[in-house]
Swiss-Prot record:
Residues 198-310 form the HD domain. Fe cation binds at residues 201, 230-231, 305. Its EC number is 2.7.7.18, 3.6.1.41. It comes from Mycoplasma genitalium (strain ATCC 33530 / DSM 19775 / NCTC 10195 / G37) (Mycoplasmoides genitalium). NCBIfam families: bis(5'-nucleosyl)-tetraphosphatase (symmetrical) YqeK, cyt_tran_rel, nicotinate (nicotinamide) nucleotide adenylyltransferase, PRK07152.1. This is Probable nicotinate-nucleotide adenylyltransferase/Ap4A hydrolase. PANTHER family: BIS(5'-NUCLEOSYL)-TETRAPHOSPHATASE, SYMMETRICAL (PTHR35795:SF1), SLR1885 PROTEIN (PTHR35795). GO terms for biological process: NAD biosynthetic process. Keywords: ATP-binding, Hydrolase, Iron, Metal-binding, Multifunctional enzyme, NAD, Nucleotide-binding, Nucleotidyltransferase, Pyridine nucleotide biosynthesis, Transferase. Pathway: Cofactor biosynthesis; NAD(+) biosynthesis; deamido-NAD(+) from nicotinate D-ribonucleotide: step 1/1. Disruption phenotype: Probably essential, it was not disrupted in a global transposon mutagenesis study.
Amino acid sequence: MKQKIIIFGGSFDPIHNAHLYIAKHAIKKIKAQKLFFVPTYNGIFKNNFHASNKDRIAMLKLAIKSVNNALVSNFDIKTKNAFSINTVNHFKSCYPTSEIYFLIGSDKLNELEKWDHIQQLKDLCTFVCYERKPYPFNKKIANQFNVKYLAKCPLEIASSKLLNQPRKKLIPLAVLNYINTNHLYLIPTLKAMVDDKRFQHCLRVGKLAKQLAIANKLDAKRAFVAGAYHDLAKQLPVDQLVNIATSELKITNYPSWKVLHSYVGAYILKNWFGVKDKMIINAIKNHTIPPKQVSKLDMIVYLADKLEPNRKQEQWSGGIEIDQLVKLAKSNLKQAYLITLKYVQNLVKD
């Protein structure tokens, strides 16, 4: 009996639970001895990827521990390969007596006739297709290329949609922890949550927070992440913002809905995205109305938000020397924080 090998290619940026469901189902239905996840090379089309080749492989290796007979191949990445024919030929040479199956989604099925070397591929391997919404299984194209129907995938997950959706139930826990430990997807997540003007503000806050952290001998990367994410929830619809604040966080007493984004942003990072770093969570939560007891990171994010370079052009800063306060914050963080806090509080009273 011939050994059966499945090739499952894709960006896996990141790998998620739908990928794992499909892999397990394919192995079972085809009775395959091996399934290889083959991440696409991130080279020519760099803008299409958010995580590096190294990180995507690392996440795959963590994820496949739950899939029997699954392996990760770096062939496409190692050889900078962009053509499926090369991938299939590689596996044919490694397993010359095996049956090769090439796993695709119904979205790719519709493009199959446009693939390079499609007739050769048809002869070298058997295409198997899983159906994913909103792309129905195209029987006409399937018959043309002898594509076997696998099943419908009940999990509607797309890697691109994970940027502004709750991730905790959609991504394997080990992968989620890897993402958060290495602060992956920060930039695309911000871009998915806020408009460009707010995004640029977040980056400036992150960069200034990093500078202040370095000057105060604190974790620069943590400060950048907290600063960049501080306005994560700033542009949520008001009704959603208020609903999360009142229903999930039980906040009932607040001066204006405009301050709720700090609490909701911290909630989203923790409960949607699985961030466990309490210092980052608290710094974001405390950046609008700081409590009496604040950490150094709290002070840094608060200051970076109020003193980032573009604040000079804004009306609120008319009576405050931003450059001088930034300089002071690098040598005496607490003093700079107290001066800025008092100024802002007086401004609000007026």
